[in-house]
Curated annotation (Swiss-Prot):
Belongs to the UPF0178 family. This is UPF0178 protein YaiI. It comes from the Bacteria. The lineage of its organism: Bacteria, Pseudomonadati, Pseudomonadota, Gammaproteobacteria, Enterobacterales.
């Protein structure tokens, strides 16, 4: 079981939460990015650098993730592919993507892309709040408890 991070767009504060969690859980944490990343020394934490390019990191995460893994991403298509493989998916704001919600999220994403393509300014997400950080940490802990229960 591994935690995969779409690290190019993942906020540093979320990475810090993940570093501490990987140590506490003794769970492999892999940060996938198209640039060099500095991570704390740990036998549980590693980086995987991929070539620059559209969806290269996403495709590598999909290729390597397995059922039971956790994927951290704000990229909805990546989350959908991870869920199809049986992995769990969580965004940096603490929202857990599920098979029941991912289709709706994909539809909304496509709708917003259509609006932007037609010239309508849709704006971006708000900056990450303390509440978002707490929600992320709580949802990560919830996932970990589910993992422990499934192991018996």
């Amino acid at each position: 079981m591994t935690i995969w991070v779409d690290a190019d767009a993942c906020p540093n504060v979320i990475k810090e939460i993940l570093y501490r969690a990987a140590e506490r859980m003794q769970m492999p944490l892999v940060l996938v990015a198209n640039q060099s990343l500095r991570v704390p020394p740990s036998r549980f934490i590693r980086t995987l650098r991929v070539a620059a390019g559209f969806d290269v990191a996403d495709n590598e995460i999909v290729r390597q993730c397995e059922a039971g893994d956790l994927v951290i991403t704000a990229d909805i298509p990546l989350a959908a592919e991870a869920i199809e493989k049986g992995a769990a998916a969580l965004n940096p704001r603490g929202e857990r993507y599920t098979p029941a919600t991912i289709r709706e999220r994909l539809t909304m994403r496509d709708f917003m892309d259509t609006l932007r393509a037609s010239g309508i300014q849709t704006g971006g997400p708000d900056s990450l709040s303390q509440r978002d950080r707490q929600a992320f940490a709580a949802e990560l802990e919830k996932w970990w408890l589910e993992v422990q229960r499934s192991r018996g």
